[in-house]
């Protein structure tokens, strides 16, 4: 039924309209449910027979095994289901009813009487509900209207209450727009529906006029690489508006920055925010095995074909990146005079010679990859280098070129990299995509190969997507399964997991263990903050900020061990693949030079046997055992795995059919993990593609996107492989697993080829191992290595200590209090309120429970309409931007750090600490947000100032101790 909040059974009396006759007046049993989302709607072809049990009135159980129910959309004429938060269902008197208590947490039986009153549709159209728009005589800006729709869709506002007075109150002609935005933002965190929004807004405006409103409720962005983007989720029965949300920009939105509000990200999800299943869009009937498109298929295709209207803007389909396609997401654009979605596609490049729909769609999406704009490179500064085939059918240089050392330094600076210059960059340049690695001998800024060219484009800006750097590596269930298949014994993995757990347990109690752990497994921007705090004497089990971050880090790693068997491998790295341009490496050899830790202190060349793999990997031949050798000519290559360009077949292609256009490889030189045998790699030659006899039309791209949802089978194949590898004696070498590996390769290539994988009936599974935690399916206790690891890690307790008033009393550090801090208390309280407001909004927006999770990026759980995989970067960037904004508030008083200016800065930092940590301020920033915890990350935005204070106090204490010892020694002497 879709996330029920509560349910009750009532005796209802229907109130007829004047036109109804009195005979219709009747008493009825009804079930009333309050829902947070629309229910999943099913339909059934009615059987015609004389039996009363075939009557639709009595045949209402969806799980009847004799019937096939099909997913459908809102069947009511005015789309009433999608506009309703209370559902009233009439219950037949003479039919057996299920035990409703089993399905609803909050359930009551009432004998009261309530009256059903006629309702009406309040949505501006019935295709997308609920969507409202302002009345024609009231000017409400798009950003305000978007927020109002969000409030209606999450139940904070009731659509029928939005009258002329309401729209007048949210018009810039009545109130300042920053106050309107702030009031609506505050409204979105009310825990119940605001039934009188005009009064509520009026009261909020009065409070704001009396108080100091510092900034917009949105986090300030002063980084050219970040943008705010609006997002819409479309379900079978409803739509949900989100944002604006912080995103890394891409080539397209940077070029059309003035039209940012005309871009929209859409995604298609089910009512419970899970991905749509292929069977929801297309059902296969038994006779003749024919497929039938459902109403959900038509809804997705209709949205892509016809667009979506929000206020005065009509958004049309634009394109989608490869990652968006996997997430069933796409970009849309609202045309304006002189610029349409078609115009933008024309600007992106010339795609007319691409006659395959899947490839055409992929090339359109190439420009939408999140990237950092660097420098312009003129065509005469680019060399066209030949590809390396080595006389074989393979392209050894597939996706890789070179960059000169000097130009690499310039690009690094544009990427804000000051400590090192990466050895390789993943790039987009014009119609080229792939990797460029440093060539110390090259005088050309860029040397690009034909395999990197995907379409024609006049764009000459070099965009960077990623670069080579220190990256820790981890085992996962697929790697463990393959290594186990190849002979690595179970006890090895059990020992590795035990060592990882011991390291996590030590880091929350021992300072040096914590420093070592976060250097090997960094937590992003806050790694240095935690490290500096530990180095200046704070203990990981005492200081609340450090403690909560490390405990959350531990909890997240334990969760990864439990759900993914993600075991840290110290003797290994995740590395970008590159090509040996010197031709010194032989087939079977690789060059590996790795940084020792995240801060790039020292590096070492690996020699000896190594294993190399590329995730995802499910064929035993995907694990390659190679020989790492030292090659002086490749000494400039750091944190890359360099493959030879010699031999019968490229090693990257042997690893899951990979290439060198930016893929990251698992590399380990741990002798315990190197199998005693290696099997032949699988043939990853892609299926032949269909070539059209005409230019690809955008309507064909719409259909391809929709068919992708129908045919996408990677998850099904991967899950089936897990089950068969766990149950079969040959593990991943079993007949079933080898066949699934072949199908998996076809499914991986589907976005490029358009050829779907067809899974035979005998490879479908009905029972799952316990470690997959499929609570709604039949399960068994796994006797394999993954099952053993899973049950062992379940014994660990991911305890996280919370910041309470008692903790505040015990942990308040008087060392951080300096003379003059009182002068900045009032200002510090203002800034603390602002910071907490924005950070709390982020936490609630993404459904993140704790401050430590959002600050560290170690998110344990989030709202179902977001995923860690897709949204982790946006969250990290939002927090980074907020910290940067807070530092700008701190610097408002000036940047003079000498003499009195320095004293003022440390006094201000001291005040920030005091209003956060002192017990008298505990909980005082939550007015109107009683459900929010007391947040403590605010003062650590200026951690460098606080650490200076702490270090000075430490030095003074040491000097005093030294003087006392000398005095005692003098007396004793």
Q: Residues of each region from the PLM?
A:
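Beta-strand-enriched accessory nucleic-acid recognition/scaffold domains that flank the catalytic cores
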Residues: 2-657, 664, 668-973
């Amino acid at each position: 039924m879709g996330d029920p909040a509560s349910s009750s059974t009532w005796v209802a009396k229907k109130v007829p309209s004047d036109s109804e006759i009195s005979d219709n007046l009747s008493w009825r049993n009804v079930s009333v449910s309050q829902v947070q989302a629309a229910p999943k709607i099913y339909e059934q072809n009615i059987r015609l027979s004389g039996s009363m049990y075939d009557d639709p009135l009595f045949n209402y159980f969806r799980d009847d095994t004799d019937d096939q129910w099909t997913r459908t959309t809102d069947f009511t004429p005015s789309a009433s289901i999608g506009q309703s938060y209370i559902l009233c269902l009439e219950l037949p008197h003479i039919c057996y009813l299920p035990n409703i208590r089993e399905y609803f947490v909050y359930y009551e039986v009432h004998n009261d009487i309530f009256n059903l009153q006629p309702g009406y549709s309040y949505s501006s159209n019935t295709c997308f509900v609920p969507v409202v728009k302002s009345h024609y005589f009231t000017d409400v800006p798009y950003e305000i209207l978007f927020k109002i729709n969000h409030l209606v869709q999450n139940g904070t506002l009731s659509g029928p209450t939005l009258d002329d007075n309401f729209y007048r109150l949210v018009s810039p002609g009545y109130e300042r727009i920053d106050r309107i935005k702030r009031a609506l933002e505050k409204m979105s965190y009310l825990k119940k529906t605001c039934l009188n929004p005009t009064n509520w807004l009026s009261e909020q405006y009065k409070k704001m006029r009396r108080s100091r409103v510092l900034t917009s409720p949105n986090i300030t962005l002063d980084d050219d690489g970040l943008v705010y983007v609006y997002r819409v989720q479309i379900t079978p029965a409803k739509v949900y508006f989100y944002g604006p949300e912080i995103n890394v920009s891409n080539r397209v939105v940077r070029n059309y920055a003035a039209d940012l509000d005309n871009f929209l990200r859409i995604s298609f999800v089910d009512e419970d925010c899970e991905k749509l299943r292929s069977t929801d869009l297309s059902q296969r009937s038994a006779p003749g095995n024919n497929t039938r498109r459902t109403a959900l298929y038509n809804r997705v295709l209709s949205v892509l074909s016809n667009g979506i209207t929000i206020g005065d803007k009509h958004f049309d389909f634009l394109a989608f990146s490869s990652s968006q396609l996997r997430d069933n997401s796409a970009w849309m654009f609202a045309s304006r005079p002189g610029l349409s979605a078609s115009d933008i596609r024309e600007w992106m490049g010339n795609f007319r010679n691409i006659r395959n729909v899947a490839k055409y769609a992929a090339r359109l999406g190439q420009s939408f990859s999140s990237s950092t704009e660097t420098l312009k490179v003129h065509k005469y500064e680019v060399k066209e280098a030949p590809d390396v085939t080595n006389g074989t059918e393979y392209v050894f240089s597939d996706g890789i070129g070179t960059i000169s050392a000097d130009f690499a330094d310039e690009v690094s600076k544009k990427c804000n990299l000051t400590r090192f210059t990466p050895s390789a960059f993943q790039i987009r340049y014009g119609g080229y995509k792939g990797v460029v690695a440093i060539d110390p001998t090259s005088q050309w800024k860029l040397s690009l190969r034909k395999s990197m060219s995907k379409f024609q484009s006049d764009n000459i800006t070099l965009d960077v997507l990623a670069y080579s750097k220190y990256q820790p590596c981890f085992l996962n269930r697929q790697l463990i399964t393959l290594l186990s298949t190849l002979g690595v014994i179970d006890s090895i993995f059990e020992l590795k997991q035990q060592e990882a757990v011991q390291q996590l347990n030590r880091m929350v109690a021992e300072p040096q263990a914590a420093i070592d752990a976060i250097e090997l497994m960094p937590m992003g921007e806050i790694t240095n903050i935690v490290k500096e705090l530990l180095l200046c004497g704070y203990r990981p089990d005492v200081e609340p900020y450090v403690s909560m971050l490390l405990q959350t880090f531990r909890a997240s790693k334990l969760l990864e061990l439990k759900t993914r068997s993600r075991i840290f491998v110290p003797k290994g790295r995740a590395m970008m693949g590159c090509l040996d341009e010197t031709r010194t490496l032989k087939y079977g050899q690789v060059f590996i030079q790795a940084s020792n830790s995240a801060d790039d202190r020292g590096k070492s060349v690996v020699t000896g046997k190594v294993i190399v793999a590329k995730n995802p990997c499910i064929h035993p031949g995907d694990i390659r055992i190679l020989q790492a050798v030292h090659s002086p000519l490749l000494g400039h290559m750091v944190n890359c795995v360099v493959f030879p360009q010699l031999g019968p077949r490229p090693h990257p292609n042997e690893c899951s059919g990979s290439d060198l256009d930016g893929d990251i490889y698992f590399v380990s030189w741990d002798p315990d993990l190197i199998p005693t045998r290696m099997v032949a790699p699988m043939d990853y030659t892609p299926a032949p593609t269909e070539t059209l006899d005409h230019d690809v039309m955008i309507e064909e791209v719409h259909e391809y996107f929709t068919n992708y949802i129908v045919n996408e089978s990677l998850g099904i194949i991967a899950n089936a492989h897990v089950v068969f590898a766990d149950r079969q004696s040959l593990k991943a070498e079993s007949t079933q697993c080898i066949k699934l590996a072949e199908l998996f390769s076809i499914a991986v290539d589907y976005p490029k080829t358009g050829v779907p994988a067809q899974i035979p009936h005998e490879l479908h599974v009905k029972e799952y191992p316990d470690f997959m935690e499929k609570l709604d399916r039949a399960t068994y206790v796994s006797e394999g290595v993954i099952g053993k690891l899973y049950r062992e890690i379940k014994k660990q307790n991911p305890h996280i200590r919370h910041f309470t008033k008692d903790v505040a009393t015990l942990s308040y550090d008087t060392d951080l209090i300096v003379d003059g801090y009182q002068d900045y208390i009032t200002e510090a309280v203002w800034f603390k309120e602002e910071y907490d407001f924005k950070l709390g909004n982020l936490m609630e927006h993404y459904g993140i429970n704790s401050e430590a999770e959002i600050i560290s990026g170690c998110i344990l759980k989030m709202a179902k309409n977001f995923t860690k995989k897709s949204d982790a970067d946006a969250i990290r960037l939002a927090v980074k931007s907020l910290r940067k904004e807070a530092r700008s508030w701190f610097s408002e008083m000036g940047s003079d750090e000498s003499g009195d200016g320095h004293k003022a800065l440390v006094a201000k930092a001291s005040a920030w600490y005091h209003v956060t940590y002192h017990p008298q301020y505990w909980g005082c920033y939550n007015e109107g947000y009683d459900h929010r915890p007391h947040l403590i990350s605010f003062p650590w935005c200026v951690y460098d100032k606080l650490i200076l204070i702490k270090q000075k106090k430490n030095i003074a204490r040491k000097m005093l101790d030294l003087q006392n010892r000398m005095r005692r020694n003098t007396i004793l002497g």
